[in-house]
């Protein structure tokens, strides 16, 4: 897996707002991102279809005991929201970059983050 996409980057990708395409490779999302995308409040039937197609093309990273333990540690030590802690722990556990535009996550020790350029529509 090349990198883990945070929910904000997945939304930019789905919305056609990435200024440049992601580099070639295989990408994953945390089970948290999967749930956040599918539970988006104003999601239309057409958008849900697009989200499900996207989810079929990426690796869905399930919660393992190791990820859960690391997420708890990050929540306690870095005071992250639990969903953010799970996403960060997932990237750390897989040893991949977290693609996110959440600047607060870039401060998490041991986490390698990469931001994307976004075009405004």
Please place each PLM-identified region on the residue numbering.
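A generic structural signal for short hydrophobic patches within well-formed alpha-helices
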Residues: 10, 34-37, 68, 105-106
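Amphipathic alpha-helical segments within well-ordered protein domains
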Residues: 35-38, 52-55, 72
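Short, well-structured N-terminal submotif of metal-dependent ribonuclease cores
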Residues: 1-29, 38-52, 121
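Acidic, PIN/NYN-like endoribonuclease modules and their adjacent C-terminal/linker elements
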Residues: 2, 88, 92-121
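A secondary-structure boundary/capping signal
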Residues: 6-7, 33, 101
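Active-site regions of enzymes building and remodeling cell-envelope glycoconjugates
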Residues: 25-29, 59, 110-118
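Active-site neighborhoods of divalent-metal-dependent phosphate/nucleic-acid chemistry enzymes
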Residues: 59-103
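Short active-site oxyanion
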Residues: 1-3, 24-26, 57-59, 92-97
């Amino acid at each position: 897996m090349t990198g883990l996409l945070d929910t904000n980057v997945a939304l930019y990708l789905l919305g056609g707002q990435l200024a440049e395409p992601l580099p070639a490779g295989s990408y994953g999302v945390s089970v948290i991102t999967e749930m956040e995308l599918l539970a988006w409040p104003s999601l239309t039937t057409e958008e849900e279809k697009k989200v499900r197609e996207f989810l079929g093309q990426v690796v869905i990273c399930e919660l393992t005991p190791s990820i859960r333990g690391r997420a708890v540690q990050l929540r306690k030590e870095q005071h992250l929201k639990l969903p953010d802690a799970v996403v960060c722990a997932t990237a750390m556990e897989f040893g991949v970059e977290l693609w996110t535009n959440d600047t607060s996550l870039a401060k998490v020790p041991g986490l390698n983050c990469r931001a994307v350029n976004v075009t405004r529509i």
